[in-house]
């Protein structure tokens, strides 16, 4: 593999440097779009409205930003975290306080898709990915849990919205967090932020942070582990080339074989990313109190373009 230099983006003085092999567009820099929130997460691009919607978790709000109208409140939430569009263009949202997965219908109603497994309430659903068959794959660590665990672990699930069926996919992660499919759906990336004493099983307390790449069969079954990246992440996204964009201190970019390609420096610690803009070459970054963007070379791999 040929050498790919790291990217350094310096906001002071508006200077940006990108190498010829950079995933960042020539001359592009990380730009702050909005600030003043408490903790931002879960950005999702709404193509028909040309705006990005994202969570402000502690304030229990979904916010929205567009180039035309700037920043405003989109709607109240129950401490929503990760968001994504389903194949019909509806927002799917993971809610900490309500411990559920909801779908925001076209008329604005929020429909609960799932809040339990085997009669026990989820911990606090964190992030969600949609497969091309419409199923929702989501992580359930306890970051928003305010009481005791009902489920004896921090698991990854698959939800069929058509039937309401929920099945467990992964039980052997300490704190599953970000989750995303490869462009063709043949791989699933799941981030684990590592062990701490919130896990009900002490065996998980010393787990290291990581990102695991799993095979996914054509029938939608989880396959074997393909490789593991020895760094964790919060939310993640992939571009059309299959490059993985993670949020560990800054935005880290990995190749399809798990090799680190670049670091995109962000003034605040990022929590999640999504692709958007009319050509899907804008990376929106939620980072602590703010929303940022940077223009990229490759478009994002998203399940929905223009339908909403």
List the predicted regions and their residue ranges.
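Bacterial N-terminal signal peptides
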Residues: 5-16
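Sequence-structural signature of mature extracellular/luminal beta-sheet repeat domains
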Residues: 19-308
């Amino acid at each position: 593999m040929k050498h790919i230099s790291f990217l350094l983006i310096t906001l002071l003085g508006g200077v940006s440097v990108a190498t010829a092999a950079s995933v960042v567009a020539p001359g592009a820099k990380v730009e702050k779009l909005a600030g003043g929130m408490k903790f931002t997460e879960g950005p999702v691009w709404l193509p028909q409205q040309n705006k990005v919607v994202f969570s402000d978790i502690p304030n229990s709000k979904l916010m929205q930003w567009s180039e035309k109208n700037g920043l405003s409140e989109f709607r109240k939430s129950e401490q929503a975290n990760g968001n994504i569009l389903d194949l019909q263009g509806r927002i799917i949202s993971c809610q900490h306080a309500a411990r559920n997965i909801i779908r925001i219908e076209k008329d604005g109603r929020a429909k609960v898709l799932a809040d339990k497994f085997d009669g026990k309430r989820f911990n606090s659903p964190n992030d969600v990915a949609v497969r091309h068959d419409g199923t929702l794959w989501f992580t359930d660590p306890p970051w928003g849990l305010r009481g005791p665990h009902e489920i004896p672990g921090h698991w990854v699930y698959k939800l069929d919205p058509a039937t309401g069926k929920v099945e467990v996919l992964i039980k052997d992660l300490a704190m599953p967090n970000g989750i995303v499919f490869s462009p063709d759906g043949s791989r699933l990336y799941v981030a684990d932020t590592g062990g701490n004493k919130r896990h009900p099983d002490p065996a998980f307390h010393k787990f290291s942070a990581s990102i695991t790449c799993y095979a996914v069969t054509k029938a939608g079954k989880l396959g074997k582990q393909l490789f593991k990246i020895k760094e964790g992440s919060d939310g993640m996204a992939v571009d059309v080339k299959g490059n993985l964009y993670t949020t560990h201190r800054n935005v880290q970019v990995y190749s399809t074989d798990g090799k680190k390609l670049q670091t995109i420096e962000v003034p605040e610690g990022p929590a999640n990313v999504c692709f958007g803009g009319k050509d899907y070459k804008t990376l929106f970054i939620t980072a602590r109190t703010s929303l940022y963007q940077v223009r990229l070379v490759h478009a994002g791999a998203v399940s929905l373009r223009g339908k909403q």
